[in-house]
Structure formats: structure tokens, C-alpha cells
């Protein structure tokens, strides 16, 4: 059986990124891994269904300057399913009220999804679906 084990995201601030996914999506943070020789730190965030995100920080990576949330080649977004339209609406409003950009929605898409798209603290697009 093939399954995606985890996705990894670069961040400028491990704690800020961790708090976003813990507070709004119920992730549980694992311990921090540190490799001082490479200027590298990382941490896994696990969700209730077993899905994981690895958040990583390094001193050797130059930030790419693009408009936050702008589309680009490569990973464009990842989706988190909440199970109901009401939960999508409620979380989207909570994120908006807490100052996180809502890029789209909540809305029903042409292919039947009910979703919104928000930006995490590093400008990654997070699609919130039913």
C-alpha cells in the first residue's frame, strides 16, 4: 500500500508555525530535532488521522520573495478536511478574525467541494474542506 507519509514545509519561525497548526487544526507537536552543524531544526506535527507535516527551519536557506499566497510551480496547496460546511465556515471566520488572510471562500466549487483557502504564517495555501 502506498500512502503519503508526510509533507514538509520550510518556515522562518518553528514556534509560530507550530502554534498555527496546533491551535487551529488540532495537530500534536513532536519533539524538536536540532542539527547545529547544518543550522537545521525540524519538528513533526501529527493530526488525528495520522497525517503529518514536518516543519523545518535552516540558517542556510534564502527566502524566496513572492507575494504571500501567490501561485507558483510546485506545491500549490494542501487540503484539510473538517467534515461539514459549518466547521469550514466557523474555522474560516476564526482564522479571519485572528488576522490570517482568507484567499478564497468559503464557497462551493464547480466540482462540488465546499472549501475556503487561507494562508498559514509563512504564506502556504491551506485548503479547508468538508
Give residue ranges: language-model regions:
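Absolute protein N-terminus
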Residues: 1-2, 130
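Extracytoplasmic/secreted proteins and extracellular or luminal domains
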Residues: 25, 71, 98-99
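Core segments of cupin and vicinal oxygen chelate
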Residues: 2, 10-53, 59
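Vicinal oxygen chelate
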Residues: 4-12, 43-47, 66-130
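A short local loop/turn or secondary-structure capping micro-motif enriched for an aromatic residue
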Residues: 61-64, 98
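Short, P/G- and charge-enriched loop/turn segments at secondary-structure junctions
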Residues: 31, 64-67
Amino acid at each position: 500500500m502506498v500512502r503519503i507519509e508526510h509533507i514538509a514545509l520550510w518556515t522562518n519561525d518553528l514556534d509560530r508555525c507550530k502554534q498555527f497548526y496546533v491551535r487551529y487544526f488540532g495537530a500534536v507537536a513532536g519533539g524538536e530535532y536540532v542539527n547545529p552543524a547544518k543550522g537545521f531544526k525540524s519538528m513533526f506535527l501529527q493530526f488525528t488521522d495520522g497525517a503529518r507535516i514536518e516543519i523545518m527551519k535552516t540558517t542556510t536557506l534564502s527566502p524566496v520573495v513572492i507575494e504571500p499566497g501567490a501561485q507558483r510551480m510546485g506545491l500549490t496547496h494542501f487540503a484539510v478536511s473538517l467534515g461539514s460546511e459549518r466547521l469550514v465556515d466557523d474555522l474560516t471566520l476564526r482564522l479571519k478574525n485572528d488576522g490570517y488572510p482568507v484567499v478564497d471562500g468559503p464557497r462551493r466549487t464547480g466540482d462540488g467541494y465546499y472549501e475556503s483557502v487561507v494562508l498559514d504564517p509563512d504564506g502556504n495555501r491551506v485548503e479547508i474542506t468538508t
